[in-house]
Amino acid sequence: MTTALDNYINSSIKRREFDCYTDGSCNNLSENREGGAAYLVLENGVEVERRSKALPHTTNNRAEMIAIISAVNFCPIASKITIHTDSKYAIYAFETLKRRLTSDVKNSDLIQKYRELAALRDVSFVWVKGHNGDKYNEIVDEMANREYNNMKESLKV
């Protein structure tokens, strides 16, 4: 329930706005299912954060979702966040999946974590076509793939 105090705070404080570009990468057919996740954050068109991480034993969808969760977590509470992603699955899982989460819902742990973070922020999604020349999407794609390749190399015997 929105209170008068909430309305006053929302109208008198300029919210910070962020554009977050995210990507995940994984070889779902590999025995180790190595992957990588990456995000890049812009505030007023200026890059303020860029991170990536290697993910062992993951899936492509989980890597995409982890990248989004990491970007949302970076942004301050009460900020307005636009997530730019090429993952239709992640958008569907985070934005559309309204049913009660149970253990049989794939990636329910990540959906729950996203919901907890997003409840404190104003998050929206923009789908971008992957590998189509979007500058920032190409950057995070390269970052996620680099982490995937590093993980793959580190697991070689």
What are these regions (language model features)?
Residues 1-2, 131:
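N-terminal hydrophobic targeting segments
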Residues 2-62, 66, 73-75, 142, ...:
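RNase H-like nuclease fold core
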